[in-house]
Design a protein with these regions (language model features):
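Cyclophilin-like peptidyl-prolyl cis-trans isomerases
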Residues: 1-110
Length: 110
């Protein structure tokens, strides 16, 4: 999968054998164009960048408000956790969630 950014592309490798429901969710949203024009709403230099708020983060919508970006998700139900033993090394993509382990929806961080 390729994440197209204004400054270049990011190749993303997904692991359906490790997190099948999360991978399917990302692929579905991407294939439906839901991630198009969605901003990175949380960036911590040298640490992580978070995006994927398809409800409030689409900068091409008339009602876009950066201060609300990061507070929403898709219209699909939240996903149950699929925790695994893969390390969070630099460049790893992971689904974002609240303190509820079963709250991943559309947001992810790298």
């Amino acid at each position: 999968m390729i994440l197209q950014l204004k400054d270049g592309n990011v190749k993303i490798e997904l692991y359906p054998d490790v997190a099948p429901n999360h991978v399917e969710r990302i692929k579905t949203l991407a294939n439906n164009g839901e991630y198009d024009n969605v901003v990175f709403h949380r960036v911590i230099d040298g640490f992580m960048a978070q995006t994927g708020d398809v409800k409030f983060g689409n900068s091409s919508k008339d009602d876009f408000n950066l201060s609300r970006s990061g507070m929403g998700g898709s219209s699909m139900p939240d996903l149950k956790q699929e925790f695994n033993n893969l390390p969070h090394e630099r460049g790893t993509l992971s689904m974002a969630r609240s303190s509820d382990p079963n709250s991943a929806n559309s947001q992810f961080f790298i």
